[in-house]
Amino acid sequence: SKLMGQGLRFRSLYDGEERLDRARAKGFVPTSECPSPSLAHRWEYLHTLHFPEGTLKNWENLDDVELVIRPTQQWLINYLPLKSVDAEKRIAKTAVAGTYRLDRVVRKKWEETAWIENTLEGLDEPGEWALNSRKGLLYYWPKQERPSKNITAPGLRELIRIEGKNNEALTGDV
């Protein structure tokens, strides 16, 4: 469905009080491996993902697409917006650094430790949705034959408001 203007962005969608799942592609395991746990924090590798052939591409709305990954360690998950994808070299860069290197999990075999969210290719089950903010389009696969009239995206007008005035003049660092 066409949204009110381009550029409208949100990362969650609701049907009444029920949170709807964002479109999720099939999971994969990164093709790179951390050479040593002591190197897992090395800053130069926190934005780089080496991925299997066919799992990522340079989507037209790449800034809407997120990588969800267990980076090197199994006890946490990062949601990272993609910055660039080179499908030929199979290297992606994220706009935000991961907590650890974006490599496969050390010392444990997983069938999938990463997946992509918010692409049309991932929209494969009823109740899922994907957003293309560049085109101002929301794609939703309803759970029933027709979509509910209670579909909403949360919005925030302001995060913090400070009002009033100080009784004393401020000097120095504040």
What positions do the PLM features span?
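Extracellular polysaccharide-degrading/modifying enzymes targeting complex plant/algal/animal polysaccharides
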Residues: S1-V174
